[in-house]
């Protein structure tokens, strides 16, 4: 349990022990928790820092430990989510609060950080800029792409609601005249509302990855909803800019053209991503320096969630932080 994120209850089957009793014994006598609680534990629920784990490439992300309470966690990419991964874990997501805690790490160590990846949160950006003066800030490509995908799906959903309203109107008209309502059926067997519902997954994929039935459905969808086709092409182009551009110099003009085309399209759902790109232009382009993403932070976040699930929730946050840092810091 010192080295692996497991619950004491998971040992019952293999060692024929009482899991709850062993958990208490581990917490009170075997783990060193009580000594830790009297020292580092005094401020554990506010922050824990591990300056020795700092490295040139860091990630910063937020995670929920218990009851939706958010913590900010800084991790070292080179630890690959294992021992030595956690550099700092801090309660809350306010930029100034995070920076004040990170300043407890000696400046000469913070100056060694060359690059830090993050999502598109302005809070994370401010905290990183205040704390790591020599670091290049990189906006995670997958968060940018997700904004475009969300905008595309928002457009599809709006058309689906329109289709549902239209079908309900026609049903009411048919009922008023004593006739049965026969919905429009396309050549693949989908009704209009089914077409818009069943197209959800194909819009997430590149056209070359569509199955035969998805290709047929996409053609029908795009023939009847050219706005969805335009939005899909914009989303796909953004994906290709990230996938094919090898340098910042190549990506910059492509991204500028893409931004102009988004503005010309005029879709309300794409306004958010246009504004986000404008606000984070430098951080977005910094991806093309080393093609660094925040995937390591997302992966580490998933490990925390899995550990929390094994424990069936976190009733004692301080003890959970003790175990988490014992394993990963």
Model-flagged regions — what are they?
Residues 23-115, 122-127, 134:
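RNase H-like nuclease fold core
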């Amino acid at each position: 349990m010192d080295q692996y994120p497991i619950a004491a209850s998971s040992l019952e089957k293999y060692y024929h022990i009482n899991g709850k009793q062993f958990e208490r014994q581990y917490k009170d006598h075997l783990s060193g928790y009580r000594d830790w609680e009297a020292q580092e534990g005094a401020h554990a629920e506010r922050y824990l820092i591990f300056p020795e784990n700092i490295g040139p490439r860091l990630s910063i992300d937020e995670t929920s430990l218990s009851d939706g309470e958010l913590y900010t966690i800084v991790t070292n990419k080179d630890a690959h989510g294992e021992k030595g991964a956690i550099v700092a874990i801090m309660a809350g997501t306010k930029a100034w609060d995070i920076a004040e805690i990170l300043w407890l790490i000696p400046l000469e160590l913070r100056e060694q950080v060359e690059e830090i990846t993050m999502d598109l949160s302005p809070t994370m950006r401010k905290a990183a800029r205040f704390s790591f003066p020599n670091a290049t800030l990189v906006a995670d490509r997958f968060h940018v792409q997700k904004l475009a995908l969300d905008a595309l799906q928002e457009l599809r959903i709006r058309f689906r609601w329109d289709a549902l309203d239209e079908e309900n109107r026609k049903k009411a008209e048919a009922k008023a005249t004593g006739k049965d309502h026969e919905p429009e059926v396309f050549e693949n067997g989908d009704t209009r509302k089914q077409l818009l519902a069943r197209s959800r997954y194909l819009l997430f994929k590149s056209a070359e990855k569509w199955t035969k039935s998805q290709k047929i459905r996409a053609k029908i969808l795009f023939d009847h909803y050219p706005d969805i086709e335009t939005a899909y092409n914009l989303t796909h182009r953004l994906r290709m800019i990230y996938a094919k551009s090898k340098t910042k110099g190549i990506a910059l003009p492509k991204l500028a053209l893409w931004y102009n085309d988004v503005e010309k399209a005029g879709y309300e759902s794409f306004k958010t991503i246009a504004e986000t790109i404008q606000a984070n232009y430098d951080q977005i382009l910094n991806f093309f320096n080393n093609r660094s993403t925040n995937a390591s932070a997302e992966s580490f976040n998933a490990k925390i969630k899995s550990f929390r699930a094994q424990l069936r929730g976190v009733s004692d946050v301080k003890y959970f932080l003790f175990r988490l840092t014992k394993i990963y810091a």
